[in-house]
């Protein structure tokens, strides 16, 4: 049964707030009033007991109730005790009495039940043994009964009971039957009795007393609250919260008594437990504005069944003992949860059937706090929640603490979706409940138009459900709020359909405010989750429009990369001036694509761009680079970027780098380069003027004059042929006589020397410098003779001494050089002569066969007879000459290498080998004839004589007998004749 909102509010809180209104400021009062209007969450939930209860109470009326661990006992006005299960189904009944049942009580084990009635009887029934029943008649109406908690375990089978007679009986089983012991009497009827452990508490007209069965004596007395209604009209209520805390609700008063005792154990052979009361404290006491029809513990608070008196009726409410009120204007009973300080935590009005006609005593409250129940942090352990039974004549209402799911549902009903979500997460509820709360929370945020907050919660609420994600993506899209959801969309676990991601990206692209989010999504999302071409098609129409932001342009470039359109991507990256564009060019070999992005690349990194242009000058010639740089200031991308563009400086860097690589590639721009060097790098101007042949001299000269570049003027004038004017600049403006001398020396013009001397004669210092630097170029005496008489030349003596010294040094060096030259000439002539004396043996054998033959004969000597390439060439020339009419210089017969071996010398004289050998033999007195040849002959085939002699000495062959060198007979004879 759903809780019914209170009709009268919380009276206690209203009183406290009214007392504080005079002490607080107006703003605080308004906040408190607003707080009062907010509905508090109930602590309990209610439902009517079903089963057989409605049918039973339709013909009878309930009078009392008792609760055990596994069952419920309901007493009725017809004297029947009905045993019900926890769902209200009747399992057993005892027709124990003939009058209304006033009280029922179970033992702790729930095996026995005791009841008392106005017929004066007390009946004890066993719940599991049909024939075990005991009935005791006291002849006066009995109002209260309580079984020994250990009734099942103990043989004494004790119980206490009392009624209108005013006697409190303790009945126990003895050897000869049951016996009653009067524990107390003489203070009016016994209205209530409760037994816990060894303590028995009862209430009479005077107050509440406590009896200790272990010590067999009364231990305390608590006086009846003053002004309480008569007990016959409003019964006192006693509840043991635990073994030491007794809760008393009487009229409008609540007291909580703490009963403490010291236990000592003494004895020698056995232990005897002794109990001595030390203290009874009233730990809590307060008054209520309502009558107490029942009370029970609720964790560290109290549950009170409140009866709201009719205003102005006062004691009239209790003037009649009849059950039904003729007026029929009674208010609903209320369940209130209060702290021990009477701080009201919650209040629920109960829609009990026929409440308009009931009095306070017509209601009762029973609870089932069993041992083992735990209460911590406002929550009971699962299955240990206490149950509360509110009994009226025609109704039994069950109240129990609300669980986490009830709490969550209440929060959802009242719009506290965020708190509901937190509660679900804390309780780790069912998946269905989590989905329900999440969907409700998102719907609530959407209704409140808190789209960003709703989007941020989607990962937590939708978790791994792909269908839920897709549903909410399209829902956000319908609301045109999809851009706020995109940053939270999952790309893995779960992965959504490709269409979902494409719709999201297109939604971002159409709104300039979310272009940055689009860029972030394109960079972070895996390429495989969507089709880049679809998104590209949606973005491309925005190119060159006002909605095309830099972020959208970069996102489009990223999409081009994903789709493999690298040139388009490069174009956008270059326009965006992205530093990584250079690496992008190298990675994808986009050198041809840089043709139209010269300015952008120079703006990014002029040095790196210059290197790139130079390396690819075949693809991007200077004729394309220079015009773009000249128009850099008008480039729309440069203007949009707002960057400073020094186009002339970029031109200087490019043309300078180009000139260093190739002097002629950029020749069309050398005139411009002269201006750029003059502006940015004056040190390079003169080397450039000297190296280049493609600039206009007149224009260069005008620039040098304008900038006052003197040495550059000298060079340009010299190249223009104005040597005298250039010399004048050197002397008159530079004053550098050494440079003037160098300049004149390079011109190779004697008239220019005269001009130099003429311009220096009027300047004594210049004359002195001229004397110092003309040694080796001009005769110093000539200069001295031209000096006018009387001209004072500074440091003339020292300079003359230096001139003479330098002249002597120069003369000595020249003599030494001449001697060296003569020696070199003689040596070279000797070498030439030796070369001319060498002979070459020609025969029909090829060179390789001959070399092999000679190697076999003279292995050591053959290593020195290697014919190099130059010798082979010479031999070829000789062979060509001997193929004509050449004759032997000895026998004058024609020579031919086909039949005979021929020896040819470099003097072009040829001999038959036999003729030459005979002549050599006849001239050698130490050698024998050829027929008895024990000698060997060698030829001057390209080996220097002196070197060969040295080698022979080193090898030990110089003393070998029978070895002689063949020489040209004619040349040798001629040389001998000339020597004579």
Curated annotation (Swiss-Prot):
GO terms for cellular component: extracellular region; HOPS complex. PROSITE patterns: CHCR, WD_REPEATS_2. GO terms for biological process: endosomal vesicle fusion; gravitropism; protein targeting to vacuole. Keywords: Protein transport, Repeat, Transport, WD repeat. Signal peptide: none annotated. InterPro entries: Clathrin_H-chain/VPS_repeat (IPR000547), TPR-like_helical_dom_sf (IPR011990), VPS41 (IPR016902), Vps41/Vps8 (IPR045111), WD40/YVTN_repeat-like_dom_sf (IPR015943), WD40_repeat_dom_sf (IPR036322), WD40_rpt (IPR001680). The keyword Protein transport applies. Residues 1-42, 931-964 are annotated as: Disordered. SUPFAM superfamilies: RING/U-box (SSF57850), WD40 repeat-like (SSF50978). WD repeats lie at residues 57-95, 96-135, 185-221. CHCR repeats lie at residues 613-769. Component of the homotypic fusion and vacuole protein sorting (HOPS) complex composed of the class C Vps core proteins VPS11, VCL1, VPS18 and VPS33, which in HOPS further associates with VPS39 and VPS41. Required for vacuolar assembly and vacuolar traffic. This is Vacuolar protein sorting-associated protein 41 homolog. It comes from Arabidopsis thaliana (Mouse-ear cress). The gene is VPS41.
